[in-house]
A protein has these predicted regions:
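N-terminal targeting signals for export/organelle localization
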Residues: 1-52, 180
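Short alpha-helical
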Residues: 79, 104-108, 130, 160
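Short active-site neighborhood of thiol/selenol oxidoreductases, capturing the structured segment around
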Residues: 60-82, 88
């Protein structure tokens, strides 16, 4: 063991090392929370999802097979969902998207909300939470990416970013360039 001189100042660890440890711990905690919240979500084959959308047209998830689909559960009263509305709307312009409005009223109320927010994506109302229960959704927002064969490729609860959702859709397609 080397002798140390008590008069010699101790070498300090660089400050960045402490920051890295703290950032690593924060990411680990956030990842753990995300995993914990996603545990009850549906896995494997996507559960059935069908109903009248906000315009009165019949929509069915199985009719969207062949391309990846974003299935997004949201609520008009949820602030995080409102923060994601623009992401979902932008993604709906070049990907298949089907959303479910959880306990947000009937089709007319949802249509009014969409029009006021200048949003244009298909919405199936779920006033009593029956669809959400089939999918294991206990809180919103919840986002599922369905692969072209109808299997759940990824599922998350909470805030997701537009690039993150687009990346999941791209991966579900097998990493091919998005259609134009």
């Amino acid at each position: 063991m080397p002798a140390t001189d008590p008069g010699q100042p101790r070498a300090r660890s660089p400050r960045w090392r402490g920051w890295l440890v703290n950032i690593g711990l924060a990411l680990l905690i956030l990842g753990g929370v995300q995993w914990w919240q996603a545990r009850p979500l549906a896995k494997g084959e996507a559960p059935p999802l069908a109903g009248l959308d906000q315009t009165g047209a019949w929509v069915e998830l199985r009719d969207l097979r062949g391309e990846p689909v974003l299935v997004h559960f949201w609520a008009s009263w949820c602030p995080v969902c409102r923060a994601m509305d623009g992401f979902v709307d932008a993604i709906a312009r070049d990907h298949r998207v089907l959303t479910v409005a959880l306990q947000s009223g009937e089709a007319g109320e949802i249509l009014s909300y969409l029009q006021a927010a200048d949003l244009d994506f298909p919405v199936v109302p779920d006033p009593n939470g029956a669809i959400a229960r089939r999918w294991g959704v206990g809180g919103v927002p919840a986002s599922f990416v369905i692969d072209p064969e109808g299997r759940i490729a990824s599922a998350t609860v909470g805030l997701s970013t537009e690039p993150g959702l687009r990346l999941r859709l791209w991966a579900a397609k097998g990493g091919e360039a998005p259609r134009q």
